[in-house]
Amino acid sequence: MKFLLDANVLVAWGWKDHSDHAPVVRWIARERGRPGTSFLSSPIPGLGFVRVSVQRSAGQISVADAADVLAGMFAALGNRHEFLPDNQPAKGFPPWCRLAAQTTDAHLRQLADSHGAKLATLDHAIPGAFVVPVG
């Protein structure tokens, strides 16, 4: 299975003080142990991680440091990590995408689908996405 990690999964994984850090770490470890599992990244979730990391109230971090943290997370996945260039146009949204807040989710879901992957998220409101179990 291939999983495109969205920004909220990356933030939970990257910061120990995040309420979903432990279950996301367990899920990644469990999936890493399964043959054929890979974790995908793309520019939008990566930028989301950097933006949220810099804005966190739990600690100040620079843009460069946040990018380094993210690079370290992907390096920890070794050959289980693959970067997906994002060549999807900003059009052709699915019928469930009706609000501005849904456009990025819809785009990432389509990007994952186009690469035979599942969008891995903590958001229960994205049709067809894989919701990482946290509870």
Predicted segments, located by residue:
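Active-site neighborhoods of divalent-metal-dependent phosphate/nucleic-acid chemistry enzymes
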Residues: 76-124
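Catalytic metal-binding/acid-base residues of hydrolase active sites
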Residues: 10, 125-126
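Short, mixed-charge aromatic SLiMs
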Residues: 36-37, 68-79, 135
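Short, conserved alpha-helical segments within structured domains
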Residues: 41-46, 104
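Active-site regions of enzymes building and remodeling cell-envelope glycoconjugates
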Residues: 128-135
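Residues that scaffold the ATP/ADP-binding catalytic core of kinase and kinase-like folds
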Residues: 12-14, 52, 129
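Short, well-structured N-terminal submotif of metal-dependent ribonuclease cores
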Residues: 1-41, 56-68
